């Protein structure tokens, strides 16, 4: 940190990487003049695991279990972008039923992610009650996930060409019951939090970002929409079946921490609307494009017919990526999650570049906290919503 300390009474404080309010192994080197923040330098990389390099040494099917360790609170989105990239590259068609199932899972995952943002955010501000409330609803979402995927987290459910399994009997009725119950829960959150005078004192006008600044910094997700920019990839660049549903982009114009809170609460309501429509309209048919599993090459003369039929029904380990490049993106809970994929006519990607929304959104933190009070750092950092597994990759 290049900072010439002329005043003797300035203090340099390390926040993290083990501090509970850091939401992961993030370290902040903060320069203070009393309670006023003079400078802040984030130190990243404590959770770096080389995810991009690992992708270059694995086939897509082998790599799928790794991606759930990026944003481990919204794993459906990391799975979605991982299978979308080769699907777009090879022009693989997805059955309509599989696309609807994906939308349902993605929106449930969005709600779970926003819930686990809301609880710790309120705990950072000193309110413990919402932290326990959010686990009540989040547990119900994980029960729904477990019934379909067998896992509460790290689901490994998406596949190239569809999903791993169909929805079990009676699951959609349980999902609709959850939607009705959860809408009441959102009302309870708003009554408890939104008009609370202590909460408003802590968040109103804190961490202001103008619309122009948000665009120039490359922010996305609630960080961008809370500054008056109505940019949501589900509307702007629709993927899966999002153009089949009626819902509204949530945005605010104030650009402060309160606006980011309101955007996320509003998004949970809209996610429920999307889920209800998807469950009501979901078509019949297959849940996976079996053609995507077949071998591209001709039958090996050394195999007998039984071996070929048996091997051909499994997810093919020799799914080769053609010599092309493309960028795909989805609207994750924290912003635009993208993959830049370069194929090379081989099993492994030649380049697998991840665009993590949390990493880019975090870059504006030093600007936001300067000239603020020390206690406001937790408010501003919490309003950004970062997961260090995604930031460090």
Swiss-Prot record:
GO molecular function: NAD binding; oxidoreductase activity, acting on NAD(P)H, quinone or similar compound as acceptor; quinone binding
Enzyme class (EC, first level): translocase
The EC number(s) this enzyme carries: 7.1.1.-
Signal sequence annotation: none
Gene3D superfamilies: Cytochrome-c3 Hydrogenase, chain B
Keywords assigned by UniProt, alphabetized: Chloroplast, Membrane, NAD, NADP, Plastid, Plastoquinone, Quinone, Thylakoid, Translocase, Transport
Compartments in which it is found: Plastid, Chloroplast thylakoid membrane
UniProt cross-references to PROSITE patterns, sorted A to Z: COMPLEX1_49K
GO cellular component terms, A-Z: chloroplast thylakoid membrane
Family designation: Belongs to the complex I 49 kDa subunit family.
Listed name of the protein: NAD(P)H-quinone oxidoreductase subunit H, chloroplastic
Organism of provenance: Zea mays (Maize)
Species classification: Eukaryota, Viridiplantae, Streptophyta, Embryophyta, Tracheophyta
């Amino acid at each position: 940190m290049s900072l010439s300390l002329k005043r003797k009474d300035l203090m340099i404080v390390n926040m993290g990487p083990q501090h509970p309010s850091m939401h992961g192994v993030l370290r902040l080197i903060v320069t203070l003049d009393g309670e006023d923040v003079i400078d802040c330098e984030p130190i990243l990389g404590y959770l770096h695991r080389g995810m991009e390099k690992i992708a270059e040494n694995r086939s897509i099917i082998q790599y799928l279990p790794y991606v759930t360790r990026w944003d481990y609170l919204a794993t459906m989105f990391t799975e979605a972008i991982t299978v979308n990239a080769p699907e777009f590259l090879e022009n693989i068609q997805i059955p309509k039923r599989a696309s609807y199932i994906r939308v349902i899972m993605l929106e449930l995952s969005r709600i779970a992610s926003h819930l686990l943002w809301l609880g710790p955010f309120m705990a950072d501000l000193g309110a413990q009650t919402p932290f326990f409330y959010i686990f009540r609803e989040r547990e119900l979402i994980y029960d729904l996930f477990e019934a379909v995927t067998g896992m509460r987290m790290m689901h490994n459910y998406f596949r190239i060409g569809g999903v791993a399994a169909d929805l079990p009997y009676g699951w959609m009725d349980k999902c609709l019951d959850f939607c009705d119950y959860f809408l009441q829960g959102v009302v309870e959150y708003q009554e408890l939090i939104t008009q609370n005078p202590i909460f408003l004192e802590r968040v109103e006008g804190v961490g202001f970002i103008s619309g122009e600044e948000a665009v120039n910094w490359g922010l996305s997700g609630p960080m961008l929409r809370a500054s008056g920019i109505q940019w949501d990839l589900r509307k702007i660049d629709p993927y899966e079946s999002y153009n089949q549903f009626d819902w509204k982009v949530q945005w605010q114009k104030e650009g402060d921490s309160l606006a980011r809170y309101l955007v996320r609460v509003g998004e949970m309501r809209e996610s429920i609307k999307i889920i209800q429509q998807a469950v009501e309209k979901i078509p019949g048919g297959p849940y996976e494009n079996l053609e995507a599993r077949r071998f591209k090459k001709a039958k090996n003369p050394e195999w007998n017919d039984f071996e070929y039929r048996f091997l051909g029904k499994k997810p093919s380990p020799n799914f080769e990526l053609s010599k092309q490049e493309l960028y795909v993106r989805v609207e994750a809970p924290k912003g635009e999650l993208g993959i830049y994929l370069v194929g090379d006519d081989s099993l492994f990607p030649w380049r697998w570049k991840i665009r993590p929304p949390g990493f880019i959104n975090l870059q504006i933190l030093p600007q936001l906290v300067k000239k603020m009070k020390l206690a406001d750092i937790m408010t501003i950092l919490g309003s950004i919503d970062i997961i260090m597994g995604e930031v460090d990759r």
